[in-house]
Amino acid sequence: MEKMSYTFSQQYEEKIRPCIDTIDNLRSLGVEKDLALPAIAVIGDQSSGKSSVLEALSGVPLPRGSGIVTRCPLELKMIRSKEDEKWHGRISYQNHEEDFDDPAEVEKKIREAQDEMAGAGVGISEELISLQITSANVPDLTLIDLPGIARVAVKGQPENIGDQIKRLIRMFITKQETINLVVVPCNVDIATTEALQMAQAEDPEGERTLGILTKPDLVDKGTEGTVVDIVHNEVIHLTKGYMIVRCRGQKEIMDQVTLNEATETESAFFKDHPHFRKLYEEGFATIPKLAEKLTIELVHHIQRSLPRLEDQIQTKLAETQKELEAYGDGPPSDPAERLSFFIDKVTAFTCDTLNLTTGEEVKSASKLLIFPELRQEFAYWNSFLDSSGYSFKLKIEEEVDNYEVKYRGRELPGFINYKTFEGLVREQMKLLEEPALKMLKNVSDMVKKKFIQLAQSSFTGFPILLKIAKTKIEAIKQDKECLAESMLRTQFKMELIVYTQDGTYSQSLLRSKEKREEDEEDTENFDCMTVGIATSNHATLSEMKLHLESYYMIASQRLADQIPMVIRYLLLQEAALELQRSMLQLLQDKDGVDDMLKEDFDIGQKRENLLSRQKRLMKAQNLLATY
């Protein structure tokens, strides 16, 4: 192939290769699995001339034929060597890597790789094939060739082959790091080409899209001006603009016209063409000019992307480290080390359990908290007691007219019957028991849920150990809940005994009377309600109400504290201690350590993947540091 004429200065050329090599090396490390890398993706409809453009750039024959020829993404890595160095090729895919020295073998090697990756036939694969070409006759450039867009499935292809190809193309062109190289024949309406429509959908402003017009020799007479307008960016605007090239046609290939001869023919075509000569003179035409344009675009794109790429690697490394910490180190193979590992695991879990129930930091799950929800439950209980007291007050007021029938015994008017007082208090206390037991159940379920979440974070990947912990948590939950329920029921039985210290009751009664007097100062009926208290049933009821409110205030305050204390003591403190004792007993079963440390295969695989990601990201970080 005739050596392409480059206008790069030597100083600029010295910067090009290291810049492109940096990204190529990152891609070879597999970093593209984790981050999007700067790239140029080549897309086009079938028969757009895409393969011819790539052949002309690389100087080697690529797979040709009807239907889908490119069946896997092909990374075409071109490295410009010194004049005296021989042509060299290297193809790599999956775990296969092969060097060869004959450019004529390229097509065969690619077909073999595609058959291996996508199966023999016409299927496609998302797996990348990497082809590296080192030659004095190629530009310093890396392109990713994607399958041509098919509209109709041919024999042997699935009906949705078109959708499969578009999905594969979108995987690349949606990334902000990708420059979209759209190949469009000159002899079709550019606005209707699917490749350009796809590029516009993902890059509406055309900031990442470069148009390549092919087959200028097939343009109908009279339409040349339209082609010139397109290249001048006057029809469909793209920020990166357009280039136009003429590659070998099918007849020239059949006539065995070499790529050397095709390059000379292309140059002559544009120089002599009455309409396209202007494009040649302006630097918008020929493969060598396209190569220069692409190299400059890629280098600038890489230079703009590198700072952001470094930040992304830092972020991804931090995320990976955090995930690895969540999965732990995995059990060692040495028996003594396995036992130590097991002891550490169980001990850490029990310590975290105690920390969780005392409000301290939980190491294995820093965001796991129990007290916010617990305080919410207890606050709701306190609020319920207040609202229940208000309902109690309304209930007494509503029953004023029925007092004589319901509550008054043989006493004369003006006397307060203590049994009546006790009866009303007991009736009210009974109404509070079921809500308290409901709160107990809510807290018990919540504590169990938190303990299980803690076990899951502590024993990630160890299903047997996790199952043992869950079983113990459930058993302890039932035991402590049953005990707490018994204590609460006993508490409410005791509440049926109306009792408090005399001084406590006197103070409460005094506060209630003072509040009553303040509330009634502005009431018109105040005088009639307070005169003749010894002979007025309403005054007696008012006095009864005062005593009931005073006592309920004391009892509700007692329950507001006592019920949460019982629940917290048994369901948190005692449950955590019992779980600690029960889990530590496992340490005595040294023969069962191997079974309990049997790791979930998926977790082990995930850890390996994370370690692999961490390794390649660290290599990538070092690579960028030396750029």
Curated annotation (Swiss-Prot):
Region (G2 motif) residue spans: 69-71
Region of interest (G4 motif), ranges: 214-217
Pfam families: Dynamin_M, Dynamin_N, GED
G1 motif: annotated segments: 44-51
Disulfide bonds: none
Any GO MF annotation of the entry: microtubule binding
Compartment(s) where it occurs, according to its Swiss-Prot or TrEMBL record: Cytoplasm
Ranges of residues in domain GED: 541-627
Main localization, broad class: cytoplasm
Region (G3 motif): 145-148
Domain Dynamin-type G stretches: 34-307
Induction and repression of expression: By interferons.
Entry keywords, A to Z: Cytoplasm, GTP-binding, Nucleotide-binding
Signal sequence coordinates: none
Keyword Nucleotide-binding assigned: yes
GO cellular component: cytoplasm; microtubule; nucleus; plasma membrane; presynapse; synapse
Source species: Danio rerio (Zebrafish)
GO biological process terms held by the UniProt record: defense response to virus; receptor internalization; response to virus; synaptic vesicle budding from presynaptic endocytic zone membrane
Keyword Transport attributed: no
Name used for this protein in its record: Interferon-induced GTP-binding protein MxB
